[in-house]
A protein has these predicted regions:
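An alpha-helical, amphipathic repeat domain used for nucleic-acid recognition
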Residues: 1-127
């Protein structure tokens, strides 16, 4: 039951996932995990082909890795901008940390962005 029989089908599937990614990136600036989940749902919705979950995630990972190499997705930038946005809305540092963890951001990026806020603000919890 392997739907990807030849190289043309594989390339067509990767190209379709890439198009979904580009259209999503035109509107939003997501984290890697957010984009991965979106692409998975979108591909399953648009395609009636039956893919194994692991194969589909491998296709998505290939597309995401090329987007990271092209600097179209950057979790460090995402963590910094999201932290600034949430601090302006009045979120506490713990709530910001939890929000970034939920978005799939690496812990070192979370620590870096929160430490930048702590350096810039006298008491970031009461901004």
């Amino acid at each position: 039951m392997n739907p990807i029989i030849n190289k043309k089908d594989l390339e067509a599937s990767i190209e379709e996932v890439r198009k979904f990614a580009y259209t999503y990136l035109e509107k939003y600036s997501p984290s890697k995990q957010q984009l991965k989940i979106y692409l998975y749902k979108k591909f399953l919705k648009k395609n009636q082909k039956i893919f194994k979950k692991k194969e589909l995630f491998n296709l998505i990972d290939v597309v995401i890795s090329t987007l990271v190499e092209q600097n179209m997705i950057n979790d460090k930038y995402y963590a910094d901008s999201k932290t600034k946005s949430l601090i302006r809305r009045g979120y506490s540092l713990n709530k910001i940390r939890y929000s970034l963890i939920k978005k799939g951001i690496d812990e070192k990026y979370i620590r870096d962005s929160i430490s930048k806020i702590k350096e810039n603000e006298s008491d970031p919890d009461f901004f």
